[in-house]
Regions:
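Positively charged, low-complexity intrinsically disordered leader regions
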Residues: 14-149
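Active-site/ligand-binding loops adjacent to catalytic centers
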Residues: 84-86, 216-254, 274, 299-302, ...
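General beta-strand structural signal in soluble alpha/beta enzymes
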Residues: 99, 119-123, 153-154, 203-205, ...
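Glycine/charged-rich beta-loop-alpha catalytic/anionic-binding loops adjacent to active sites
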Residues: 116-127, 146-152, 244-251, 273-278, ...
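A glycine-rich, Thr/Ser-enriched phosphate-binding loop motif common to dinucleotide/cofactor-binding enzymes
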Residues: 128-139, 250-265
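A short, small-residue-rich loop immediately preceding and capping a beta-strand
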Residues: 136, 144-183, 276-289, 310
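Active-site-proximal loop->helix
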Residues: 161-224, 320-333
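Long hydrophobic segments that form regular secondary structure
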Residues: 254-255, 259-299, 303, 371
Length: 380
């Protein structure tokens, strides 16, 4: 009788455990379940985006053009239409420092909202730098180190991208120079200190280190700066240093590519609880975060197996997708970048900080990619 009672008790515990597993707060993966490839949505797009143009001749940019700034690995990925691009073993091994990231059920938020909907969020804040930015910083710096580069140059707004690059540069033993928008530079000393701890040199932008910065300071000595100005300074600085390469946190195809580990993990995690979302919502600035979670889900819509609504939430201070004009424009104030086809409020538009659209996201917005219908919600 005691043995029977014990077995019944164990069976009862087992049933409770099964029930708990079916409705968890967090859905976790093992390191072996980290994606082995990045997903390139260009491989599934029937209509390709308009080409990025060289401003000197208004012709499509070439590999040679980008090779002046970026590592060879990133240049290859920028022009690739291959659907799946293998993640290098060394990069995937470094991803294991914090990946896979949890998919969390927001049960208390559901209760407060009084909704029957299941709300999940992907917690990318567990990365060493505190954001999704590290997903691209590590491969970009990896490819630069592979090319024999000794120094990495970049820009940052609030400091998340700069922190991610500083962390990656420290892993590969490279020097790191960060141009940080002056407003956040003064307002967020903790981010600045974090970059310093990882060995980066941080310069407030606009600065006296570049012609773009000097011009801005001459016009307004008290300028708080903008991300567009910081990009210009970083590109100018990198262009004159033969031993360095520039890395960027949004804009380019290869950045969006690297971020797709987010959505791929989500798909695997939902499979663990036999769920699949009908709506994907993500904040949208330069497009990397939105693309990271949305693009892998768009694959199933493009092949006709699923129907999903994609919602982008953009800042009301820079409503580029909802109020911007679709045209070719620079991605920075100083006109150092190529010309991108995108929804833009103008490269010289000056909110705090400066924003511009991501070309591939913009192409989705004009409905050439029917999975993205352009539901746009303004954040504060």
């Amino acid at each position: 009788l005691q043995q029977l009672t014990k077995r019944q008790s164990m069976n009862s515990i087992g049933k409770e455990q099964v029930k708990t597993k079916a409705d968890p707060y967090k859905i976790l993966l093992t390191e072996d379940e980290i994606p082995t490839h990045w997903y390139n949505i260009l491989g599934d797009m029937k209509t390709q985006p308009q080409p990025t143009l060289d401003p000197e001749n208004n012709q499509p940019v070439t590999r040679e053009y980008y090779s002046k700034l970026y590592s060879q690995g990133c240049v290859d990925q920028e022009f690739s239409t291959e659907k799946w691009i293998e993640i290098p073993d060394e990069v995937r091994d470094l991803y294991k420092i914090w990946r896979p990231t949890p998919l969390v059920r927001a049960k208390r938020l559901e209760k407060i909202l009084g909704t029957d909907c299941k709300i999940y969020y992907k917690n990318e804040g567990v990365s060493p730098s505190g954001s999704h930015k590290t997903n691209s910083a590590i491969p970009q710096v990896y490819y630069a180190a592979k090319d024999g580069v000794k120094k990495i140059i970049t820009e940052t707004g609030a400091g998340q991208w700069g922190s991610a690059v500083a962390f990656a540069a420290q892993l590969f033993g490279l020097k790191c120079e960060v141009f940080m928008v002056r407003g956040p530079y003064n307002q967020k000393p903790s981010r600045r200190r974090l970059m310093h701890l990882w060995g980066a040199h941080v310069t407030p932008s606009p600065s006296d280190q570049t012609s773009v910065g000097r011009k801005q300071l001459a016009e307004n000595p008290d300028s708080r700066g903008s991300l567009g100005t910081a990009i210009s300074e970083a590109i100018e600085y990198a262009s004159r240093d033969a031993g360095s390469k520039y890395v960027i946190g949004s804009i380019q195809n290869f950045v969006l590519l690297h971020q797709t580990v987010i959505g791929q993990e989500c798909i695997t995690q939902f499979g663990k609880v036999d769920e699949f979302p009908d709506t994907i919502i993500a904040p949208l600035g330069g497009g990397a975060n939105f693309a990271g979670i949305a693009f892998p889900f768009m694959e199933s819509v493009l092949n006709g197996s699923k129907k999903i609504k994609f919602i982008a939430s953009e800042p009301a201070t820079c409503p580029k997708l909802s109020e911007g004009e679709f045209r070719y424009d620079y991605g920075d104030v100083g006109k150092k970048t190529p010309l991108f086809p995108m929804y833009t409020l103008g490269h010289d538009f000056m909110p705090v900080p400066n924003h511009s659209g991501r070309p591939k996201i913009s192409w989705c917005r004009i409905d050439h990619l029917s999975t993205y219908k352009g539901w746009l919600y303004h954040g504060t």
